[in-house]
Amino acid sequence: MIRKLIIGFILMLVVSFYVFPIEFTFLPRSINSKMFIAVFGILAYVFDSIRKGSAEISGSVLMAGLMAITFSVWCLLSITVSTTSDKTYVTYILSFATWLTGAYGVYAALRMGYKTVDLQILVRYLALVGVFQCVTAVLIDNYSGFSSFVDRFVVGGGYYRRSMRLYGIGAALDPGGIRFSVIQVMIAHLFATNPNVRNNRQSQLTLLLAFSIITIIGSVISRTTLVGSGLGLAYIGFSLVKLRQGGFITLRMMQTYVVFLFAMIGVLAFSIYFYSVSRTFHGYLRFGFEAFFNWAETGVFRTHSTDILDTMWVWPNDPITWLIGKGTIANYINGTDIGYCNFIFYCGVIGLLIFSSFFIYCHWTHVRKFANFRITALLLTALTFIVWAKVTSDIFFIDALLFCIAGDVLTAEGESDREDALPETELATP
């Protein structure tokens, strides 16, 4: 039992260091944990290819790679025409490759503990990582000894403290909130579609608890988390309504309704109680859910951040920049954080369309690999375009992971249409 817990904790750290990359104080700032996992992924790929006797890459990954190259080339054209030196997205193909090989590193690590790494295993580890980040963020904020220990090895703590922001081990600000949102969408997918979850009240409660913790604490780390909370809750609610097929209410449906209802009541009661008795938790909720408190108290749904964001909708004033951009994005040079504005200034509408097509393809190609994935693909697509209204972002990490793991759609021959990105070896479960 202890051995399994240790293995599980190590695997959770591997997933966390990939999803929430960190820079170490004792290494050059350009090196982060995701790169180490990517190197491990390359070695695992080479080993698996030699063992299998061939190097295989799925057609979906090749197509995604071609689209990433196209975007990088277009960005190169943009900065060349504009005679600028900002290569932020010119090197996107390298980011793509790092995320993909890192995802295979995560997959290879999980395979050491599980014979087959499927979507259920991946989502459970993502949920565990989300909870881990939230718990460590609270510990860092409330215990100076723990905070000092983390800051001794991980870069960034001093900046977040000066900014009065809650942070975890790699989870902070909008990038952290966006990754929390992706995790919430995937939790909702597992809750809504997986029969092993639907038939197990403990699994349902565990996932709902993880979802709730990420919603509450994750929103304090970054209010962008609420985007994933809204999308995830909408999917869970839709799935509960959809259970009633043919006009009949079954015992299983009633059990699911009761579990969901009591879980939500418990979370609400917990939040109200600690909001009343804990000054720290009171501050957390006031910050994370500022818009809702403002709406309840003043009738206006707004936050300080949205007020600032409203002033950042700036656009080019010449047709050439609208079309191909002017190759500027770094260091707030465009006077905006908004993703759409920055993409247009950097690579124009054409570049924005290429990048949008890349994410649409990556999200929707998984529909052929995973059962009941259409709504999830739609939510991931919606998440991509919603958060661009606030910041430039990249959620390819989840697509890279989905490219690597085993699929669950059956072909006509009865075999899983897995289309793994890279070859798999059969390892025994420890």
Model-inferred region functions:
Residues 1-7, 48-53, 197, 248-259, ...:
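A juxtamembrane structural motif centered on a specific transmembrane helix
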Residues 1-52, 73-81, 398-401:
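N-terminal signal-anchor transmembrane segment
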Residues 9-15, 205-210, 364-392, 396, ...:
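Loop-to-helix entry and N-terminal half of a specific, functionally important transmembrane alpha helix
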Residues 42-52, 78-135, 358:
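Transmembrane alpha-helical segments and their membrane-water interfaces
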Residues 43, 187-189, 233-236, 377-385, ...:
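Transmembrane alpha-helices of multi-pass inner-membrane enzymes
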Residues 120-148, 171-221, 226-239:
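Alpha-helical transmembrane segments of multi-pass inner-membrane proteins
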Residues 234, 346-385, 413-414:
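Hydrophobic transmembrane alpha-helices and their immediate junctions
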Residues 275-324, 332-342:
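Membrane-interface loop/short-helix elements at transmembrane-helix boundaries
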